[in-house]
Amino acid sequence: CFNLYSSKHISACAIPRVKVDDKPEPFKNATSILNWWSSIEQRSIELSLKYRYMFMTDITNCFGQINPESISWALARKDTPHETNENEELASNIRHYLRAMQEGRNIGIPQGSALFSLIAEIILGYADMLLAKEICECQKNGSLPEDLEYDVLRYVDDYRIFCNDSEALDKISYMLQHILERFNFRMHSSKTRTSYELITDSIKPDKAFYIFNTPIVSKQTYLEEDGKERKVPGYDFDGFQKHLLFIYEFSRRFPNSGQLVRQLEEFSKRVETQL
């Protein structure tokens, strides 16, 4: 099912995963958090090296607005080259049990269960298929450049669309909006925008605030070596990437400053000590 939903330019990053071992996670939802970090944050930063613009949005009350009828459309892959009627009985059973669970309520699905996350992913994956199909048709009829480069990352109901052509990006975002409306979905107005600061906006706002407001300065740490204590430089963040993000934000506010040069020199020394 999910293999058919895959597209060269559209990546579904929240397909439910199963741990390969029985070891307990170090903290709740560790697998999901790591998946978000690698497939959304890190991939977005990678794409920022290729693209100039990023459209960001998410769906308002996604699970609560799901139309159960769309389960049938998704499992049938309606209006796509892979349309099938093999899953009619499965779709009917899912809708039946959903109505029973919700005392006849015919809109929305429960949230918080891996099963319902899977159902939502099937529906949103089908929406990805429709978006890829519509973009392809627009490239064929000339309303979008045939050689258009773009990438779409979706993590459940969180979308990021990357492109170097601002007009094409607007068209793709409108296509997405119209497709989502067919599923009774609405874009969250306060979270919908086009970003020109792809590096900083690739990171969740709370995490970015923490990074940019925690000073990464040299401090003295005592370590024992050969029975002796010595002072070595230490840093508030262990990882190089967060250190670089701090320097990047500092350079935006104070370009060509002496402090910026000093921070770059300190970072260079830090890298040298690890080589």
At which residue positions do the language-model features occur?
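Conserved two-metal-ion catalytic palm core of "right-hand" nucleic acid polymerases
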Residues: 1-111
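Active-site palm subdomain of RNA-directed nucleic acid polymerases
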Residues: 83, 118-156, 161-171
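Right-hand nucleic-acid polymerase module
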Residues: 39, 45, 53, 57, ...
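Short, flexible loop/turn elements at secondary-structure junctions
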Residues: 59-63, 123, 163-165, 194, ...
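Short, glycine/acidic-rich hinge or "gate" loops at secondary-structure transitions
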Residues: 5-13, 83-93, 136-153, 188-194
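Conserved catalytic core of two-metal-ion nucleotidyltransferases
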Residues: 181-215
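Amphipathic alpha-helical scaffolding segments
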Residues: 69-81, 125-129, 175-180, 195
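Helical (often loop-to-helix) elements that flank the catalytic cores of nucleotide-handling enzymes
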Residues: 162-187
